[in-house]
């Protein structure tokens, strides 16, 4: 899975205090499952799809707007279909907030993600894993 590390980099680019204190951002993969048709191509390739929830926990944070903006911008580039499925406002990013003192919050955001993996036989044995069209990009903040 390569999207979690990329989203972390994008959040750090948008919120510099996460670079200064990286312990304030925790990312965990939860509720994961793999799907596949099991079909084998003429070249022997098989593919599968990671489906999971990436939970971003921002600790002792002073506002929710910046993380949500960074995540929505990232999703627009890396999970466009997810954003398009939200049209009508009936779905979105689940989140929870623990309100602390002095205007600080702990913010937990659940982000449903997918990543396709193609597994092809490698010359000389072994397997090559490719994540097509899953080269995550960090949009300009």
Which residues does each PLM region occupy?
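Long, contiguous binding/interaction regions
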Residues: 1-49, 57-141
């Amino acid at each position: 899975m390569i999207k979690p590390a990329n989203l972390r980099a994008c959040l750090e680019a948008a919120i510099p205090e996460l670079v200064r204190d990286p312990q304030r951002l925790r990312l965990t993969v939860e509720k994961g499952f793999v799907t596949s048709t099991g079909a084998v191509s003429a070249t022997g390739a098989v593919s599968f799809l990671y489906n999971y929830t990436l939970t971003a926990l921002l600790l002792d944070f002073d506002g929710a707007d910046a993380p949500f903006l960074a995540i929505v911008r990232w999703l627009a580039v890396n999970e466009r279909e997810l954003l398009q499925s939200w049209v009508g406002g009936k779905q979105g990013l689940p989140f929870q907030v623990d309100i602390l003192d002095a205007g600080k919050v702990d913010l937990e955001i659940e982000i449903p993600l997918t990543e396709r993996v193609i597994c092809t036989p490698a010359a000389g044995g072994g397997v090559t894993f490719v994540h097509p069209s899953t080269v995550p990009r960090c949009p300009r903040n």
